[in-house]
Amino acid sequence: MAIVQHLFGITMQNSANLEQRIAELEMKITFQEGIIEELNQALIEQQFVIDKMQLQMRHVANKLKDLQPANIATQAEETPPPHY
């Protein structure tokens, strides 16, 4: 033990401080893991909402296409007025 203390400069006080610092780091890691899990769940929920909204948007776009009369030319097909 004295050799280890001499080689690494570890004393009982230093050992207690290291143990305390390790315990604090373990608590911080545990807290961060919880936060990461919460963020992951929020991200999953947001992606679900985005997917649902994209599906709804495609549905609305298809309905608009169906409502558009076939006999009306698109803006690209229209000839410009004579004053152009």
UniProtKB/Swiss-Prot annotation:
InterPro entries according to UniProt: SlyX (IPR007236)
Any matching Pfam family: SlyX
Family per record: Belongs to the SlyX family.
PANTHER family found in the cross-reference section: PROTEIN SLYX (PTHR36508:SF1)
User: NCBIfam families, alphabetically?
Assistant: PRK02119.1 (NF002556)
Designated name of the protein: Protein SlyX homolog
Gene name, Swiss-Prot/TrEMBL:
slyX
